[in-house]
């Protein structure tokens, strides 16, 4: 009971904290938020380990939807990178019933992340008439799953034919794994094309870049969260990118979590921030390809860190970049940027953007 209580106490705090992943604006309050959020996430992971066992900690992330129910004894895990859905339970009584209920709810859940608390065991998943996973999963007869009857039949089939169990030394873990369709990534991307096109026209940002950022940040997971509290499809942080965009639009404060979990709003804010990087923070870079490389890297690590790769003086940095070929700028950012994550990020986004340009 104590460990369940600990999780109940942690969950509200997790929702209230926020930090940053992008941008160069740091202040004391942000540092406190960052440290506090990281500590709380560590405590959350520790308590999951106490319940599930060593090496059995699974927590929601940018490309992983993870929802616990049944006093944290049942969980649904969608890996949007691998294209797998794993439903597991450690319930000591009627584990099949717990799995069946979780399978049906996961298959039929909607796409409203603001209504689901990923850090509590509250069963707040509502069955939707237009399930988020519709078309990304097919049942044993090869049909997409929209209605509860088909989801229930598929759950029964899975429990009869694919139920597995394993022991971690302390508990028996029962599980069922569902493979998503091979083109699940494209299926998710297609859901947001209209929103991407609208934001592209509004801010003058290439559609292929927006899609590449979304793929790299979240694999088109609208429930995406990170340990740095970046939220939604484009992993926007309230107090940095969100605040910058609001200020540029004449709004005070920062966008709320529910606002950033709304796909259209998230894409709008993320695209507006890309436009700010391109037109304001890195506007001194003349060559559009060189500037695109800088913008991509800055979306991950901040404009200041990009310019400092070339010079501590921002104006001089832009001047140096303007004497280089785009290929040299790319090579420099992917080899000399101090952040390994940012170096890899440019490669990933640039590669993804090429694939969207060919479509």
UniProtKB/Swiss-Prot annotation:
Its EC number is 4.2.2.n1. It is found in: Cell outer membrane. It is a lipid-anchor. Murein-degrading enzyme. May play a role in recycling of muropeptides during cell elongation and/or cell division. One of its GO terms (biological process) is cell wall organization. It comes from the Bacteria. This is Membrane-bound lytic murein transglycosylase C. It holds the Pfam family Mltc_N. The keyword Acetylation does not apply. The keyword Membrane applies. GO terms for molecular function: hydrolase activity, acting on glycosyl bonds; peptidoglycan lytic transglycosylase activity. Its main location: membrane. The lineage of its organism: Bacteria, Pseudomonadati, Pseudomonadota, Gammaproteobacteria, Enterobacterales. Keywords: Cell outer membrane, Cell wall biogenesis/degradation, Lipoprotein, Lyase, Membrane, Palmitate, Signal. InterPro entries: Lysozyme-like_dom_sf (IPR023346), Murein_transglycosylaseC (IPR023664), Murein_transglycosylaseC_N (IPR024570), Transglyc_AS (IPR000189), Transglycosylase_SLT_dom_1 (IPR008258). A lipid is attached at residue 17 (S-diacylglycerol cysteine). Residues 1-16 form the signal peptide. GO terms for cellular component: cell outer membrane. Gene3D superfamilies: 1.10.530.10. It catalyses: Exolytic cleavage of the (1->4)-beta-glycosidic linkage between N-acetylmuramic acid (MurNAc) and N-acetylglucosamine (GlcNAc) residues in peptidoglycan, from either the reducing or the non-reducing ends of the peptidoglycan chains, with concomitant formation of a 1,6-anhydrobond in the MurNAc residue. Belongs to the transglycosylase Slt family. It is an enzyme of class 4 (lyase). A lipid is attached at residue 17 (N-palmitoyl cysteine). Disulfide bonds: none annotated.
């Amino acid at each position: 009971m104590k460990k369940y209580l600990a999780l109940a106490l942690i969950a509200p705090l997790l929702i209230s904290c926020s930090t940053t992943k992008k941008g160069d604006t740091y202040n004391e309050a942000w540092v406190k938020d960052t440290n506090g959020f990281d500590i709380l996430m560590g405590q959350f992971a520790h308590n999951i380990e106490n319940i599930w066992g060593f090496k059995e900690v699974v927590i929601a992330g940018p490309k992983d939807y993870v929802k616990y129910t049944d006093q944290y004894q049942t969980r649904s895990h969608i890996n949007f990178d691998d294209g797998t859905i794993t439903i597991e339970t450690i319930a000591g009584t009627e584990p099949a019933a717990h799995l069946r209920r979780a399978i049906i709810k996961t298959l039929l859940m909607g796409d409203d992340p603001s209504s689901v608390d990923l850090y509590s065991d509250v069963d707040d998943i509502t069955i939707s008439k237009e399930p988020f996973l519709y078309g990304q999963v097919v049942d044993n007869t090869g049909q997409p799953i929209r209605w509860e009857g088909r989801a229930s039949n598929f759950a029964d089939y899975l429990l009869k034919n694919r139920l597995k169990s394993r022991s971690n030394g302390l508990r028996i873990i029962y599980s069922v794994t569902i493979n998503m369709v091979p083109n699940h990534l494209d299926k998710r991307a297609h859901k947001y094309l209209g929103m991407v096109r609208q934001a592209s026209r509004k801010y003058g940002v290439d559609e292929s870049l927006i899609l590449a950022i979304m793929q790299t940040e979240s694999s088109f997971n609208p429930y995406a969260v990170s340990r740095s509290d970046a939220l939604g499809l484009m992993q926007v942080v309230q107090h940095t990118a969100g605040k910058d965009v609001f200020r540029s639009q004449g709004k005070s404060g920062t966008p709320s979590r529910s606002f950033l979990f709304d796909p259209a709003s998230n894409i709008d804010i993320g695209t507006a921030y890309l436009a700010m990087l391109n037109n304001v923070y890195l506007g001194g870079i003349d060559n559009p390809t060189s500037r695109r490389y800088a913008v991509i890297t800055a979306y991950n690590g901040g404009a200041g860190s990009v310019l400092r790769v070339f010079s501590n003086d921002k104006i001089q940095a832009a001047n140096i970049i303007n004497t280089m070929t785009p290929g040299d700028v790319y090579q420099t950012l992917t080899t000399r940027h101090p952040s390994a994550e940012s170096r890899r990020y440019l490669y990933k986004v640039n590669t993804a953007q090429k694939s969207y340009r060919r479509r």
